[in-house]
């Protein structure tokens, strides 16, 4: 797919225009209501449905240097956090436009880089006041050895904070049935054992939860403590204490740390719903996976006292297209595919315990472990492509079978590829071989069966063989998909491995469904790992916008920035330039946040046009500035479910409105990477472009408009 068409003025900053063009293609991915796109291969004309920035950039023509740079930034964010790429892409475009506007006004590049970098760092310090601590979200759930039979879990999904329809709560039902663990406890949203094992209460039964919701509302401001800034000694400000100050518009200083009341999240159900971001079905699966891992750990370790840490490496996905979405579920064990030729074998052996060996690497005659030094004096020559009785592979295959027969091995899990000839031989001798097994799967089966992974079959002895593995059909043998494969389930007693089976009637949606599931999983993972989240619904971006406008007004009104500690040792020219241009650059940076919030409101259909959204935002920004404390204003508005600032478009039934949360570090790092990309392109092109002043003087002739 080629880059979205956009007229690029060669007399202006080409790199920034290219960034803006790339970023505009992913605008619809922002917010809880994401519009999907079709990516069509120009050569084979195959199409795939995508709704993520990573998939989008994989399908774009990134032949230019700017495209490669943007893709590297997005890939770095995705490889590290798996979330935040849509925010990164959008802010790259918004801040590219902001930098372009600054260049049109004749602001020096060094000033733009300096002020924008320090402005973002100031925002990052300011939003610390909107962090919500997460404490003991699993403590309310009973971790005793009392167990119950896990029945079908009917998960009626809780509403998202911003339901764009506004006419009712978004509901969707899923059935989650764990066929492999009939002795796991289930818990209600309040943390007690549930008589009816449901991860979420049905909407029509939520009247019984009013007391819980009322407690959450009453505790909104009951906790008081001072949050310390993570950047207490920033190099960008001259501070001698650990306080976090920002300048108010009237010239006084506000100490954000003095905010006496903060939110707190102590319930896992509330946390999961707040991090769903509109994708309730995926979050229901993610939440069920975390609960299942927690329950499994509690059963294995009755006296377990250490805090629970969600091990994301023990969670896998298995995508099965062609089935209704109601078949999606999570359960203990390993779900994978085998060919139709294995159906008869599994039917014969599914009621018997399997003895298993684990192979690290390939199970082929030519495989050698990493670091193996092959002798230079041995040469192998094959006269025919067909295997003969005396060939090396045939001899090797026979030797492998002898080892398997000697130790009565009926299941072989291989991390790499497997010889097709060996697979056929094993099938004839009623032995199942499964290749391309994830390393974490091997480790999980090693722990559960006491098997010892080996590199070669020749290393196998009795101590390396595990036992107690059961193999069953995950779905009916008659439900064969288009690739002529059947899904099977491998389990063992006490195994710490969970598979989320994702189904969809449309094959084109499978990739999108898997991406959204992992996004929900990683939001939960980062939140539980950091033990803190941000207030969501645009609250953090709103505070950044208000904070920058306060700084800009303060700079404009006073003209003397010594109290802020901006570059005290800089040259007189730099100091004078900062004094003149700082308000403009800060407002341009704030414009990126303004555009961000406006795009979310338009995508969620809470406002019919960008003009109305921007007007709505600016009105509340002014209210926040006039209040003297934007952070307190935001916390106050969060306590008013009917305020319409961070709860626009929600249902009229306010008792059913949950809080919205967002991750901390992934969001902040997405901001940093977005600005780094923009400023890097700006500085790189500025070093190789000459005649910049002449170009800007003639911009009126080129564009018809001269920015003043």
Swiss-Prot record:
Signal peptide: none
One Gene Ontology term, aspect cellular component: cilium
InterPro entries: BBS12 (IPR042984), Cpn60/GroEL/TCP-1 (IPR002423), GroEL-like_apical_dom_sf (IPR027409), GROEL-like_equatorial_sf (IPR027413), TCP-1-like_intermed_sf (IPR027410)
Main location group: other
SUPFAM superfamilies (UniProt xref): GroEL apical domain-like (SSF52029), GroEL equatorial domain-like (SSF48592)
Subcellular location field: Cell projection, Cilium
GO molecular function: ATP binding
Gene Ontology biological-process entries: chaperone-mediated protein complex assembly; eating behavior; fat cell differentiation; intraciliary transport; negative regulation of fat cell differentiation; negative regulation of stem cell differentiation; photoreceptor cell maintenance; stem cell differentiation
Keywords per UniProt: Cell projection, Cilium
Pfam families the UniProt entry points to: Cpn60_TCP1 (PF00118)
Subunit structure, as described in the record: Component of the chaperonin-containing T-complex (TRiC), a heterooligomeric complex of about 850 to 900 kDa that forms two stacked rings, 12 to 16 nm in diameter. Interacts with MKKS.
Protein name as it appears in the record: Chaperonin-containing T-complex member BBS12
């Amino acid at each position: 797919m080629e880059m979205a068409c956009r007229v690029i003025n060669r007399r202006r900053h080409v790199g920034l225009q290219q960034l803006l063009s790339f970023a505009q293609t992913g605008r619809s991915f922002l917010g809880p209501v994401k519009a999907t796109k079709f990516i069509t291969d120009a050569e084979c004309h195959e199409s795939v449905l995508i709704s993520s920035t990573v998939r989008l950039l994989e399908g774009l023509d990134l032949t230019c240097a700017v495209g490669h740079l943007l893709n590297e930034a997005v890939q770095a964010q995705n490889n590290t956090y798996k979330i935040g790429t849509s925010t990164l892409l959008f802010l790259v475009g918004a801040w590219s436009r902001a930098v372009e506007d600054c260049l049109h006004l004749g602001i020096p590049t060094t000033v733009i880089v300096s002020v924008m970098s320090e402005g973002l760092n100031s925002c990052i310090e300011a939003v610390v006041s909107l962090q919500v601590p997460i404490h003991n979200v699993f403590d309310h759930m009973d971790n005793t050895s009392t167990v119950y039979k896990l029945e079908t879990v009917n998960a009626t999904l809780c509403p998202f904070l911003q339901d764009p329809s506004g006419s009712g709560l978004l509901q969707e039902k899923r059935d989650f049935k764990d066929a492999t663990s009939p002795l796991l406890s289930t818990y209600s949203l309040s943390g007690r054992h549930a008589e009816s094992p449901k991860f979420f209460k049905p909407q029509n039964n939520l009247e019984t939860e009013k007391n819980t919701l009322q407690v959450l509302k009453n505790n909104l401001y009951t906790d008081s403590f001072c949050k310390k800034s993570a950047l207490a000694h920033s190099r960008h400000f001259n501070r001698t204490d650990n306080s976090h100050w920002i300048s108010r518009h009237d010239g006084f200083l506000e100490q954000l740390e003095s905010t006496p009341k903060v939110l707190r999240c102590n319930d896992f159900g509330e946390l999961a719903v707040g991090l769903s971001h509109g994708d309730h079905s995926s979050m229901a699966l993610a939440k069920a996976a975390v609960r299942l891992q927690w329950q499994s750990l509690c059963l294995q370790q009755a006296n377990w006292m250490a805090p629970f840490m969600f091990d994301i490496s023990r969670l896998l996905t298995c995508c099965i297209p062609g089935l209704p979405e109601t078949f999606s579920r999570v359960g203990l064990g390993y779900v994978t595919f085998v060919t139709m030729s294995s159906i008869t074998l599994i039917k014969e052996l599914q009621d018997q315990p399997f003895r298993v060996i684990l192979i690290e690497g390939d199970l082929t005659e030519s495989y050698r472990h990493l670091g193996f030094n092959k002798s230079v004096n041995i040469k192998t020559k094959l006269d025919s492509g067909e295997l003969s009785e005396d060939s090396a592979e045939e001899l090797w295959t026979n030797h492998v079978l002898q080892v398997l027969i000697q130790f009565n091995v009926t299941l072989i899990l291989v991390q790499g590829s497997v010889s097709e000839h060996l697979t056929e031989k094993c099938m004839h001798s009623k032995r199942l071989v499964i290749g391309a097994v994830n390393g974490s799967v091997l480790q999980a089966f090693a722990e559960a069966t006491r098997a010892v992974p080996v590199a070669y079959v020749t290393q196998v002895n009795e101590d390396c063989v595990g036992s107690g593995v059961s193999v069953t059909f995950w779905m009916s043998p008659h439900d064969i998909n288009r690739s002529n494969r059947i899904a099977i389930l491998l389990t063992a007693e006490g195994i710490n491995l969970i598979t989320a089976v994702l189904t969809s009637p449309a094959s084109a949606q499978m990739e999108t469904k898997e991406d959204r599931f992992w996004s929900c999983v990683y939001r939960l993972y980062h939140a539980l790992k950091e033990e803190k989240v941000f207030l969501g619904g645009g609250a953090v971006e709103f505070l950044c916008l208000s904070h920058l406008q306060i700084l800009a007004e303060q700079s404009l009104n006073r003209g003397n920035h010594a109290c802020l500690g901006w570059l005290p040792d800089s040259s007189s020219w730099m100091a004078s330039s900062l004094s003149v241009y700082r308000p403009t650059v800060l407002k341009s940076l704030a414009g990126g946040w303004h555009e961000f919030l406006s795009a979310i409101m338009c995508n969620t259909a809470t406002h019919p046009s960008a003009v109305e959204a921007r007007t709505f935002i600016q009105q509340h920004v002014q209210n926040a500035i006039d209040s003297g404390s934007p952070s307190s204003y935001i916390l106050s508005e969060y306590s008013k479910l009917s305020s319409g600032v961070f709860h626009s478009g929600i249902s009229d039934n306010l008792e059913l409105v949950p809080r919205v949360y967002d991750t901390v570090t992934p969001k902040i790092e997405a901001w940093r990477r977005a600005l780094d990309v923009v400023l890097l392109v700006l500085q790189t092109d500025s070093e190789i472009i000459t005649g910049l002043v002449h170009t800007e003087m003639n911009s009126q002739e080129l564009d018809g408009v001269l920015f003043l």
